[in-house]
Amino acid sequence: VSSLATVSVEEISNLVDTPKMFQFYYHKDKGLNNSILQRAKDANFDVMALTVDTITGGNRERDIRTGFTSPPKFTLSSMFSYVTKPKWAINYLTKGKFELPHLQDYVKEGTNTAISIGNYFSTMLDQDMNWKDAEKLCSDWGGHFALKGILSVEDAKRAVDIGCTGIVVSNHGGRQLDGARSPFDQLADIVEAVGDRVDVICEGGIQRGTHMLKALSLGAKACAGGRLYLYAL
């Protein structure tokens, strides 16, 4: 569950009793960071994963082309889509108002003010976040803690040194930096270096069951993905 989720940690905690991991985005607003951390604690989330590969927005060409924002803006193109797909319009009018419940008490952008994801990352997240910040967040959380976005052996070893119990080998689906290395290409070396001390999760490019089998065979403890439900997994 992400800091930018459209459903709150409290609601999710009441709905399911399975293990839950929170994906933390480190904002400039330290009050917001503290609020999110405490809410995840109070909702009995099991793992905190600090995202370290998006402290600034990437050049998301698809979002630029489609004009995607949060919340969605009405444009000629989107209105045409609603006209040709009436179920979309019905859902928009009858379902709950779009909101980002973890953020809305602190920032208008994303809930009341439309903004692209790239611009949100570049203006709201803390570009000065460093290893000391990650270590403090790990200590403040006091439970299972992971860094999400690790792609090198050196960073994997440093993650272990600051107290991480897991790492997510990920390039954010290739959307942050199109020239970033593939998680699959880095996985074996990272597992060899730290796999006996922390859980290593592979994320990125997972679109079918055989991809999971390959990642597990390289030593990953698990696989993750943002759109697995779209691939009938």
Roles of regions detected by a PLM:
Residues 1, 9-10, 160, 165-202:
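Extended hydrophobic/aromatic segments used for targeting, binding, or gating
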Residues 1-161, 173-176:
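Active-site entrance/lid segments in N-terminal catalytic domains of soluble metabolic enzymes
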Residues 34-37, 151-163, 190-202, 206-221:
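Catalytic cores of alpha/beta
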Residues 52-58, 164-180, 212-233:
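Glycine-rich phosphate-binding active-site loops on the catalytic face of alpha/beta enzymes
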Residues 61, 68-70, 84, 159, ...:
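Alpha-helix boundary/interfacial micro-motifs
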Residues 146-151, 168, 202, 224:
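Glycine-rich anion-binding loop/nest that anchors nucleotide
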